[in-house]
Amino acid sequence: MAAIRRSWLQQRLKGSREPLDSGSRQKVFALKHRSTRDVVEDLRNGDRLITVDDEVDPNLEMAEIQRRVYLRGGPAILFTNVRGCKFPMASNLFASLDQARYLFRDTLERVRRLIEVKLDPSALPKSPMRYAGVPMTALTMLPRFTRSGAVQANQCRLSELPALKSWPMDGGSFVTLPQVLSADPEASSNLMRVNLGMYRVQLAGNEYDPENQVGLHYQIHRGIGVHHRAAMDRNESLQVAITVGGSPAMSLAAVMPLPEGLTELTFAGALSGRRVRMIRGSHAPVYADADFAIVGQVDPTATMPEGPFGDHLGYYSLQHPFPFMKVEHVWHRKDAIWPFTVVGRPPQEDTTFGQLIHELTDPIIPTVIPGVKAVHAVDAAGVHPLLLAIGSERYMPYLKAKEPQELLTQANAILGNGQLSLAKYLWITDDPDDSIRIHDIGSFIQHILRRVDWRRDLHFHTKTTIDTLDYSGTGLNQGSKLVVAATGQSTRELATEIPSGLSLPDGISDPQLVMPGVIAVKGPKFTGDASREDVQRLTAHLEHQPGLESVPLITLCNDSEFAAATLNNWLWLTFTRSNPAIDVDGVGVQVVAKHWGCRGPLIIDARVKPHHAPPLVEDAEVTAKVDARATRGDELAKYL
């Protein structure tokens, strides 16, 4: 039956590579990927997959291949000959936003229309033909129990699973596309209270028993933490299932920031076009259509060292104590394929997740936080370090002199809302003319720089929580935040070249224009607290220099040429390597009624500090090995 279905699927897809026209009538049939093999065959038939039959090592080599193929705009990759492993592996399934749309081409428009109806219920009776498929889509959102599933076809040992290691200093092998499922200990049979998240899983290394234990790294503001707390309060183990593969909708749902009342399983059902089936048992609910499942229990009071791991900020997440699972079962489908991704300094494949998430959630934002029209977590800056927002300024519309008022209320609401609360820098403005494009990052920043008053518009949050993966702060999860809120008319022109009379103190040199109004300068290596005097010398030197009104922002860094080479370079180093409360300074500092401000320019010390995590660097031998592959002239070589 599966062969017949697959043959029919191939005939349907033959020659069809473009996503369905979003304006066309909804199709009755929806592509329902039930396994990674279904996904692979779908991509193959759309000329979006290459197959690598040569042996490839999952220890660093496979990850380097994936990074290169993604950056060169390549297709998905199926590795059929994995060294030391009997399972094929697949990567780059989300190779681009276009490919992600292709995977969900029969359901994405339905999800959009479902969102439209949720935002405006009156749209349904007004346009019944447009929303004719909404009731059926709503039915697919109800997860259901089943007694068994395809994932239970075979058992294997934990050590037989693919041992993917992505970066040289990683503490072992990791699952990089995990679907971590936990049941609410207070309602274990209620699928609407199951949490699905993508929390990294360490399969081997450190002190883990390679056959019986896996590490679980979940951070602050993660749903599984609520279940962990409940299990701890009840003095019982937390039931957890880690699944890999199945419908790609499960992977997207695991990272989707969803509003209250909408669970990951309901969203996955809508996006996959079928109800999510979960296996009922004495264990946590298990996704029945997954390719692999690791099932077990977590002692809520016990931890083990987890990491290091090369993460999406472009640095290593260091070793820290985290929970671990005692493994009871390892299951896999017949003909299972292990999907994986590789994270590192953006852009990587998870960039596509962010793009699709923005596309789906942008219309929802105004309903979540009143007055906020749009938000953009900047991928190039590592996502959480920099958040841009467009709000509204309506408190005193009759006043000619404009200053941020309602924007500050909205900024506080943003920093108190779910995943948005992890933002370290929040730049917010209003847009009464609807002329600002929030995804045009350079233009957005320049819009604020033309209006900002550094004496008034800086609002620090000190000694607070920040993203677990951000090592710019004073400790794990500890640091500060800075809101930059600006409104009104432009008050300055921005320099389009280095001011001719610019003078710098000894040890600080090589000024480079990053973009209009922003300069990067090279400073001495940061060696300790004494190095903070470099910033004081710089501010004192600039105190009485004329011609700096058009340069409101200066970044002090280790390599100003690198910082100015691309906007992405500047975004990455400026916002990942600075802790606002410590590393933000300026010319003409004043503190009035405990409010810190400066005349300007504002200076951000984005030099590498001794407490920062090391950046991700490829292994030279592996790089040479992959370089050699690039000379073979095969289908893969052109992307290497």
Model-derived features: positions:
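Extended, highly charged
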Residues: 8-13, 25-309, 313-324, 328-640
